[in-house]
UniProtKB/Swiss-Prot annotation:
GO terms for biological process: mitochondrial translation. Present with 1550 molecules/cell in log phase SD medium. Component of the mitochondrial ribosome (mitoribosome), a dedicated translation machinery responsible for the synthesis of mitochondrial genome-encoded proteins, including at least some of the essential transmembrane subunits of the mitochondrial respiratory chain. The mitoribosomes are attached to the mitochondrial inner membrane and translation products are cotranslationally integrated into the membrane. The lineage of its organism: Eukaryota, Fungi, Dikarya, Ascomycota, Saccharomycotina. Belongs to the mitochondrion-specific ribosomal protein mL59 family. This is Large ribosomal subunit protein mL59. GO terms for molecular function: structural constituent of ribosome. Component of the mitochondrial large ribosomal subunit (mt-LSU). Mature yeast 74S mitochondrial ribosomes consist of a small (37S) and a large (54S) subunit. The 37S small subunit contains a 15S ribosomal RNA (15S mt-rRNA) and 34 different proteins. The 54S large subunit contains a 21S rRNA (21S mt-rRNA) and 46 different proteins. Keywords: Mitochondrion, Ribonucleoprotein, Ribosomal protein. PANTHER family: 54S RIBOSOMAL PROTEIN L25, MITOCHONDRIAL, LARGE RIBOSOMAL SUBUNIT PROTEIN ML59. It is found in: Mitochondrion. Pfam families: Mitoc_mL59 (PF18126). It comes from the Eukaryota. InterPro entries: Ribosomal_mL59, Ribosomal_mL59_dom.
Length: 157
């Protein structure tokens, strides 16, 4: 496939971008004069007479659209450099992503944190409940509980 055929297979948005900003020109990675040939269309550039910065020719949204299309068609290396922008794309975005504190291992609410301790206390209390009731009701009740336990045990095994 020749370069001409490959260029014709690109989407209209990419074609128009490369016609307006040909990849043969080495674009500046930093802001330059608006009249300079190598003025980067993705960066704000300074007007030589007024010394004021002009907005970039392509906004961040349009730059992102062009970059994503170029990435899909494998021609992103022909785009002007965008290193000093804070915009990250695709793999870079997910590789450099820092997770918020507590996302991987969430701390939980107070009632969730104390749940295991609470269940252990409950089990211990259930084991000691007969002794507690016997101490409050007296020895007569304690003897009755012991008889009930003996009768409940199955001895025919």
């Amino acid at each position: 496939m020749s370069y001409k055929q490959y260029f014709d297979s690109l989407p209209l948005k990419l074609k128009s971008f490369f016609q307006r900003y040909p990849p043969s020109i080495k674009y500046s990675p930093v802001s330059t004069s608006t009249k300079a040939i190598n003025a980067n269309p993705f960066l704000p550039n300074k007007h030589p007479v007024t010394q004021r910065f002009h907005d970039p020719k392509y906004s961040l949204r349009r730059m992102s659209d062009v970059y994503k299309l170029a990435l899909r068609y494998g021609v992103e290396e022909f785009l002007p450099p965008i290193e000093n922008t804070k915009k990250l794309f695709f793999e870079e975005k997910y590789n450099k992503k820092t997770l918020m504190k507590g996302v991987l291992l969430p701390k939980g609410h107070k009632h969730e944190l104390k749940l295991n301790e609470k269940l252990k206390k409950r089990e211990e209390a259930l084991k000691k409940v007969d002794e507690l009731i016997a101490s409050k009701k007296g020895s007569k009740y304690a003897k009755r509980v012991e008889k009930m336990k003996k009768n409940q045990s199955i001895g025919w095994f």
